[in-house]
UniProtKB/Swiss-Prot annotation:
Residues covered by the Peptidase S50 domain: 494-736
Pfam families: Birna_VP2, Birna_VP3, Birna_VP4
Keywords annotated in UniProt: Capsid protein, Host cytoplasm, Hydrolase, Metal-binding, Protease, Serine protease, Virion
Acyltransferase recorded as keyword: no
Active site as annotated: 633, 673
EC numbers: 3.4.21.-
Region Disordered, annotated ranges: 950-993
MF terms in GO: metal ion binding; serine-type peptidase activity; structural molecule activity
Reported modifications of this chain: Specific enzymatic cleavages yield mature proteins. The capsid assembly seems to be regulated by polyprotein processing. The protease VP4 cleaves itself off the polyprotein, thus releasing pre-VP2 and VP3 within the infected cell. During capsid assembly, the C-terminus of pre-VP2 is further processed by VP4, giving rise to VP2, the external capsid protein and three small peptides that all stay closely associated with the capsid.
Name of the featured protein: Structural polyprotein
UniProt site (Cleavage): 422-423, 468-469, 475-476, 482-483, 493-494, 736-737
């Protein structure tokens, strides 16, 4: 994203550079015709951004100015690479006397060069391309358009900027300019073979254009070549001039290459060309070149014949002209019907990788770019599908602003693609992500860690292919394994001398991806399957610790394990294979450390494997180097698997140590195991205060354990509301980074503590305090507090001053609850029910009796909407929850306006009081407006029409009221008759008679 700042291109061009964002801001004045054209070079690697032209009254464009970056890059930097660029064109400034923004914009991106365009008129631009993602039309100038630079090539080198270099010579002020010689563009122009010129002598000579050709140049160029002339006329003199012509048709540069060159008869006369035009002389884009020949005769008289013939060619070399983005594509933005004198603003940002010149390098730190083949390959794949993904080169500015979040989501390889899913692009992007990483892992073996870290939709197996490509094969040589319905992915490998051909197969509903890996190394056996489908399994958490010695745990974590029927060592990580324990019936449980006998009687063998996640009918295997487990934490899950033999994974984790007597013993580290279950969206079942309290014996467990747990709500650990926002992520990273280890000594120590607690009440109390600290997650806090209070003085003072049971402070804090039982706030469910009841009571006070608490809960915990209220008022039927009834909200209700209301409105509109009454025709017009508006008065547009109608009727009505005479300034004001007092009335003539 250009507006988010510069970033290094993640390719393998590793040169130390600095990143810089350069702004471009121009206020362009609109010409007399109100039309103009802005030419952008969105991919040009340098300071040039574009050029502005105004349309003249004769229909031709006139050059106004070049558009550049704010800083002149060649003055401080030697080499450059363009990373990204975006430019916005809009108008928000009005000249005096103009009160509204007028005008529209057409914009198009043309994949060729500027000189190749044949129609650059406002409407003709839209025919330059048929790609709808490269053109937009009739955008209001107030909204504006945004031009986006999309890469046309990758893995590009740095471009020399044409920086000045001091020259050594007689004049120390002379400088040399080092231009880019990388990828020049060469135009070869050939004159017609044996071109024949014939004319009569004229004073001042006869001028002809020998040739004219289209070229494109905005940087330095050179012209080289030669022409050969032959003549049979004595005294002929030739002059040759080369013109470089701009886009507007005016001459930008003129160079005389021959002046008064005499021709010798009967021989070849050579005229060589060798011109160099520096960048600073090219003041506007060049689009054509012309060679003119002036023919004259020494001592010629009127009527003398002048004859010659010519042949030859020349070449125009544009330095760096074929560098991708330098001259093509171009984006043209044309505006039309904008008020004269208005200001069109061009603003944007260009992001560069720059290598400073030696002077600046003394004070500027440079760094190498980041080589990320995955990101580079992903970018190529995304932009190759840009038409399908809706990525355009020109945008309405408001639409581009709205799409920025979509671009940011697509750029993040780990994003869940929510916005892309809303636009229907999710499947395309996910397919691209699946393709991008195998190519990275195959072609770039050192990037194997990247393949493991890509995230959603990428299989960990691809990283193993990268290891195989680098010489450590991860597939068994010559052992073909067929894909089955249970296995989502597997590796099939065959040894062919020094090559290993590996194919990644998937089940029929997924595509097949093939990859060829070359390896001279020795093959080692490994399967590395990551997911098992439709496999019955039971789950149980195991506490895993990192220890400093046999009795000092350093950190506690927990891992979820699955019990699968049969011998399935191929699903285990290499660290667990070959290790098993026998049960009382002689069967084996693989994945356990060979420590004694498991106190269970089973009817078959089982395998215990670590897992990372569980889905509806599949489990995701873990590749962490987990050692064989010890202890009896998995006895309950193994027993359940042996009795019920489920066909799908049971979505409830089990905990508890089942002994030979059928009793379920409580386990320690309750909060750690709960966190592990919740992280996978599972509930924890076992004896005690777990999510499901199954009781202390096997019979109670069978009755209370849910046999259809797949219908339970999943509460992902990462989204639990009572945790800090980043707690789930930190827990996940901690588990991924921990060094797992569990020892038999730790299990023995736990059992020894439980035995001591049964004998010593004081130790039982101490153990209860420890479990209380562990369950509430404050073990570390208490340990830190103990270090700061070695003699327990602060703790004694705290306990001595603690409120006693029944005290005033105790009742104020805990209410009527017992000591130590702190009053709690309502649960989310209770708070939601209280809110529903509160809304229902409020509706009841307003006379809306159908909004019961149950109805409010079904309506999304909100009161009735306007549509629901209208429906209930009109039909007196209870509206359905979550139905908006929009027809009742927006339906127009007809009502008739009274004649008095219409007459009053007509009189008010037709004229002021005291003037003539409105004619019946005008009253009828007002009545029509009221009828159209269903009884409402006229709106603004209708009021304008009625005022115009009244004005016309007044002018053609001979009986219209005469205008009132203006009062004379010297006329005495007449005192209006009125009351002389409260009890005195005026005497009239009748009273006198």
């Amino acid at each position: 994203m250009p507006t988010t700042g510069p970033a290094s291109i993640p390719d393998d061009t590793l040169e130390k550079h600095t990143l810089r964002s350069e702004t471009s801001t121009y206020n362009l004045t609109v010409g007399d015709t109100g039309s103009g054209l802005i030419v952008f070079f969105p991919g040009f690697p340098g300071s040039i951004v574009g050029a502005h032209y105004t349309l003249q009254s004769n229909g031709n464009y006139k050059f106004d100015q070049m558009l550049l970056t704010a800083q002149n890059l060649p003055a401080s930097y030697n080499y450059c690479r363009l990373v990204s660029r975006s430019l916005t064109v809009r108008s928000s400034t009005l000249p005096g006397g103009v009160y509204a923004l007028n005008g529209t914009i057409n914009a198009v991106t043309f994949q060729g060069s500027l000189s190749e365009l044949t129609d650059v008129s406002y409407n003709g631009l839209m025919s330059a391309t048929a790609n709808i993602n490269d053109k937009i039309g009739n955008v209001l100038v107030g909204e504006g358009v945004t031009v986006l630079s999309l890469p046309t090539s990758y893995d590009l080198g740095y471009v020399r900027l044409g920086d000045p270099i001091p020259a050594i010579g007689l004049d120390p002020k002379m400088v040399a300019t080092c231009d880019s010689s990388d990828r020049p563009r060469v135009y070869t122009i050939t004159a017609a073979d044996d071109y024949q010129f014939s004319s009569q002598y004229q004073p001042g000579g006869v001028t002809i254009t020998l040739f004219s050709a289209n070229i494109d140049a905005i940087t330095s160029l050179s012209v080289g070549g030669e022409l050969v002339f032959r003549t049979s006329v004595h005294g002929l003199v030739l002059g040759a001039t080369i013109y470089l012509i701009g886009f507007d048709g005016t001459t930008v540069i003129t160079r005389a290459v021959a002046a008064n060159t005499g021709l010798t008869t009967g021989t070849d006369n050579l005229m060589p060309f060798n011109l160099v035009i520096p960048t600073n002389e090219i003041t506007q884009p060049i689009t054509s070149i012309k060679l003119e020949i002036v023919t004259s005769k020494s001592g010629g008289q009127a009527g003398d014949q002048m004859l010659w013939s010519a042949r030859g060619s020349l070449a125009v070399t544009i330095h760096g002209g074929n560098y991708p983005g330098a001259l093509r594509p171009v984006t043209l933005v044309a505006y039309e019907r904008v008020a004269t004198g208005s200001v069109v603003t061009v603003a944007g940002v260009s992001n560069f990788e720059l290598i400073p010149n030696p002077e600046l390098a003394k004070n500027l730190v440079t760094e190498y770019g980041r080589f990320d083949p995955g990101a580079m390959n992903y970018t190529k794949l995304i932009l190759s599908e840009r038409d399908r993904l809706g990525i355009k080169t020109v945008w309405p500015t408001r639409e581009y602003t709205d799409f920025r979040e979509y671009f940011m989501e697509v750029a993040d390889l780990n994003s869940p693609l929510k916005i892309a899913g809303a636009f229907g692009f999710k499947d395309i992007i996910r397919a691209i992500r699946r393709i991008a990483v195998p190519v990275v892992s195959t072609l770039f073996p050192p990037a194997a860690p990247l393949a493991h870290a890509i995230g959603e939709g990428v299989d960990y197996l691809l990283g193993d292919e990268a290891q195989a490509a680098s010489g450590t094969a991860r597939a068994a040589s010559g052992k073909a394994r067929a894909a089955s319905g249970r296995i989502r992915q597997l590796t099939l490998a065959a040894d062919k001398g020094y090559e290993v051909v590996a194919n990644l197969f998937q089940v029929p509903q997924n595509p097949v991806v093939d990859g060829i890996l070359a390896s001279p190394g020795v093959l080692r056996g490994a399967h590395n399957l990551d997911c098992v489908l439709r496999e019955g399994a039971t789950l149980f958490p195991v506490v895993i610790t990192t220890v400093e010695d046999a009795m000092t745990p350093k950190a506690l974590n927990s891992k979820m394990f699955a019990v699968i029927e049969g011998v399935r060592e191929d699903l285990q990580p290499p660290s667990q294979r070959g290790s098993f324990i026998r049960t009382l019936s002689g069967h084996r449980v693989y994945g356990y450390a060979p420590d004694g006998v498991l106190p269970l009687e089973t009817g078959r063998d089982y395998t215990v494997v670590p897992i990372d996640d569980v889905w509806d009918d599949s489990i995701m295997l873990s590749k962490d180097p987990i050692p064989p487990i010890v202890g009896n934490s998995g006895n309950l899950a193994i027993a359940y698997m042996d009795v019920f033999r489920p066909k799908v994974p049971i979505h409830v984790a089990m905990t508890g140590a089942l002994n030979a007597c059928g009793e379920i013993e409580k386990v320690s580290f309750r909060s750690t195991k709960l966190a592990t279950a919740h992280r996978l969206g599972l509930k924890l079942a076992g004896p005690g205060a777990f999510d499901v309290n199954t009781g202390p014996n096997w019979a109670t467990f069978i009755k209370r354990f849910p046999h259809n747990p797949r219908d339970w709500d999943r509460l992902p650990y990462l989204n639990l509301p009572y945790l800090p926002p980043n707690a789930g992520r930190q827990y996940h990273l901690a588990m991924a980074a921990s060094e797992f280890k569990e020892t038999p000594e730790l299990e023995s120590a736990v059992r020894a503590m439980e035995a001591a607690a049964n004998v010593d009440p004081l130790f039982q109390s101490a153990l209860s305090v420890f479990m209380w600290l562990e369950e509430n997650g404050i073990v570390t806090d208490m340990a830190n507090f103990a270090l700061s209070d070695p003699n327990a003085h602060r703790m004694r003072n705290f306990l001595a001053n603690a409120p006693q049971a029944g005290s005033k402070s105790q009742r104020a804090k805990y209410g009527t609850a017992g000591y130590g039982v702190e009053a709690r706030g309502p649960t989310p469910e209770e708070a939601q029910r209280e809110k529903d009841t509160r809304i229902s009571k409020k509706m009841e006070t307003m006379g809306i009796y159908f909004a019961t608490p149950e109805w409010v809960a079904l309506n999304g915990h909100r009161g009735p909407s306007p549509g629901q209220l209208k429906y209930w008022q009109n039909t007196r039927e209870i509206p359905d929850p979550n139905e908006d009834y929009l027809d009742y909200v927006h339906a127009e209700k007809s009502r008739l306006a009274s004649e008095e209301q219409i007459l009053r409105a007509a009189t008010s509109i037709y004229g002021a009081p005291g003037q003539a009454e409105p004619p019946q025709a005008f009253i009828d017009e007002v009545a029509k407006v009221y009828e159209i508006n269903h009884g409402r008065g006229p709106n603004q547009e209708q009021m304008k029409d009625l005022l115009l109608t009244a004005m016309e009727m007044k002018h053609r009505n001979p009986r219209r009221a005469l205008p009132k005479p203006k009062p004379k300034p010297n006329a005495p004001t007449q005192r209006p008759p009125g009351r002389l007092g409260r009890w005195i009335r005026t005497v009239s003539d009748e009273d006198l008679e």
